[in-house]
């Protein structure tokens, strides 16, 4: 977003990043999902779950001309990025990795590069079996012809910092370019190294120890709940990236709203009925998975698509996106989950409701159903 705003002339300098602290809510939720490893995680290895961490990562993003004019130290250039949605499951990735690969392809294409150009990838690498298997498949599918690629998961050292993970790992990627030093995935035993050598193929997974390497192009990948995928590419040089903007006129072709309409004490609440769900073929069993925030988002989204006479299919699914605005998001779900964790204990959180406490769950449900 910062890059887009700079290219549109909306500003010269933007501060971008993320921060997250360790919380009982996150611990309780991931414990309920059986996603925590009792030992330190070692992604793409023997790990059976994540290790939670906390931290913050910030990047100052600036136009080249403005940076040169003020004599700024330049670490690298942001070449391009890509995003996608699995539209598959609220917590698990698509097993075939197609959603992840879509984001990676878009990042490479927007950077005017080829897959063979990438020198280092800071992988999402959480340490859970499903995530690691899907990402391992994605990497080998797309970069099979790249004989100089290094990949690591720095979550093995920092833990999964959740909302801060993407920005922290972006900093690792930038430092890899600046220092010509690629960070490792730690936690490999001698036996683990034997297994890795049999499955790694041409990819250097940097086990246990960092090493020097000329890194001209680095990629950082983040794949989140709801099937939200993002990939970004950094470069050590200034490049002329093709301007793909078409200056097209943009129109509104579909609208919808869900609001309270009564004038009594219920005026602030939307009165949803079975008819609201039935008209879109949404089954009650599916609705029960959703918190109120997600229900409203799903129904209003489906209403707008219907009003625009758009059906999502194989021909347009990769050209259709979702942008959602919210002030409080799933706050009710967050409070309810936290109250239960406090009264019952952090080890007795609900695996059913925890996914609904993340802000991108509503968009994830809409993408899955539509």
Labelled PLM ranges:
Residues 2, 60:
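Conserved RecA-like P-loop NTPase ATPase core
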Residues 9-13:
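Alpha-to-beta junction loops
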Residues 3, 19-20:
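Acidic/serine-rich, low-complexity amphipathic helices located in mid- to C-terminal regulatory regions
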């Amino acid at each position: 977003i910062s890059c887009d705003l700079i290219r549109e002339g909306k500003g010269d300098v933007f501060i971008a990043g993320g921060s997250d602290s360790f919380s009982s809510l996150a611990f309780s939720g991931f414990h309920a999902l059986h996603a925590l490893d009792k030992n330190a995680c070692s992604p793409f290895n023997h790990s059976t779950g994540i290790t939670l961490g906390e931290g913050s990562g910030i990047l100052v993003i600036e136009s080249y001309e403005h940076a040169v004019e003020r004599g700024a130290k330049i670490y690298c250039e942001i070449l391009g990025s890509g995003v996608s949605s699995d539209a598959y499951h609220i917590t698990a990735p698509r097993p075939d990795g197609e959603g992840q690969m879509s984001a990676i392809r878009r990042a490479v294409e927007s950077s005017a590069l080829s897959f063979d150009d990438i020198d280092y990838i800071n992988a999402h690498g959480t340490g859970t079996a499903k995530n690691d298997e899907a990402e391992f498949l994605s990497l080998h599918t797309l970069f099979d012809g790249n004989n100089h690629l290094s990949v690591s998961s720095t979550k093995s050292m920092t833990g999964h910092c959740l909302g801060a993970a993407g920005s922290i790992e972006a900093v690792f990627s930038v430092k890899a370019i600046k220092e010509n030093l690629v960070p490792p995935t730690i936690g490999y035993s001698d036996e683990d190294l034997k297994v890795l050598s049999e499955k790694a193929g041409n990819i250097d997974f940097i086990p246990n120890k960092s090493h020097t390497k000329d890194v001209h192009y680095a990629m950082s990948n983040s794949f989140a709940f709801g099937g939200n995928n993002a990939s970004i590419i950094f470069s050590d040089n200034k490049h002329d990236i093709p301007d793909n903007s078409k200056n097209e006129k943009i129109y509104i072709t579909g609208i919808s709203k869900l609001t309270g309409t009564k004038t009594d004490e219920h005026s602030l609440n939307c009165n949803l009925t079975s008819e609201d769900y039935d008209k879109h073929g949404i089954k009650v069993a599916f609705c029960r998975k959703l918190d109120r925030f997600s229900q409203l988002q799903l129904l209003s989204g489906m209403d707008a698509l219907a009003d625009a006479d758009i059906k999502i299919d194989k021909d347009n699914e990769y050209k259709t996106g979702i942008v959602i605005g919210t002030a409080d998001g799933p706050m009710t779900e967050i409070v309810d989950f936290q109250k239960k964790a406090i009264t019952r204990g952090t080890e007795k959180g609900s695996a059913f409701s925890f996914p609904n406490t993340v802000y991108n769950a509503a968009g994830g449900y809409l993408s899955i159903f539509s």
